[in-house]
Amino acid sequence: MTAHAPDPIHQFEVSRLIKISIGNMDLSFTNVSLFTVVTVVITAAFLFISSSSRGLVPTRMQSLSEMAYEFVASTLRESSGVQGMQFFPLVFSLFTFILVANFIGLFPYFYTVTSQIMITFSLAMVVILTVIGYGFYKHGISFLKLFVPSGVPVVVLPLVTMIEIISFLSRPISLSLRLFANMLAGHITLKVFAGFIVSMIGVGIVGVGGAVLPLIMTVAITALEFLVAFLQAYVFTVLTCMYLNDAIHPGH
């Protein structure tokens, strides 16, 4: 009997675990909700355990948490100066949440919540709304200088201003799509090659030899996906710091 390769899209299916309805609103607890909670719990537990150590020689967990702290702190200072450190709790929370969510999604039977566009878009909207809110709170109407670059000829200023506004409004879209698309594509590719292995083995003894190459590719892609998981959290964090700098220094 020939084995059928699993559907690579099935892993992203949202399934209802607990039905919750209020009027016409469906607020059911889904697998996405579950693994979002799992991600938060794992992240909080890791940070709590790593920060509770008081030894002179730091443990591995403590060293990892300190590396994450220094990365976010240095990125904020480089992009926004000392003033950017007021956003450290937000940026650090986003970085650790995305990093843990990306990593745990690589393990069997774990769901990758960052492969859902609504999750990534929600994270992006938190960033953009923070930028807008802080910008107007700190600078008032002067925050709009962000859309009026200095040194631009008056003739083309309306066009440039419109382009700047469109570019700003597209930030949450590009920020969310980048993370969503990379996690989605990587997991689909991994599942496709894993499906090749199942299909080849299902052919019989002859197919076992043909499954070697897909197996090698699966191992290589898995290693690559761990790198991508970190890089996507890194890129999201760096872009967040750059956007926050616009709120702190809108005229620069």
From Swiss-Prot:
GO terms for cellular component: plasma membrane; proton-transporting ATP synthase complex. It is a multi-pass membrane protein. Belongs to the ATPase A chain family. Keywords: ATP synthesis, Cell inner membrane, Cell membrane, CF(0), Hydrogen ion transport, Ion transport, Membrane, Transmembrane, Transmembrane helix, Transport. One of its GO terms (molecular function) is proton-transporting ATP synthase activity, rotational mechanism. It is found in: Cell inner membrane. F-type ATPases have 2 components, CF(1) - the catalytic core - and CF(0) - the membrane proton channel. CF(1) has five subunits: alpha(3), beta(3), gamma(1), delta(1), epsilon(1). CF(0) has three main subunits: a(1), b(2) and c(9-12). The alpha and beta chains form an alternating ring which encloses part of the gamma chain. CF(1) is attached to CF(0) by a central stalk formed by the gamma and epsilon chains, while a peripheral stalk is formed by the delta and b chains. This is ATP synthase subunit a. It comes from Bartonella tribocorum (strain CIP 105476 / IBS 506). CDD domains: ATP-synt_Fo_a_6 (cd00310). Key component of the proton channel; it plays a direct role in the translocation of protons across the membrane. The chain crosses the membrane at residues 29-49, 87-107, 117-137, 146-166, 196-216, 219-239. Its main location: membrane. The keyword Membrane applies. It comes from the Bacteria.
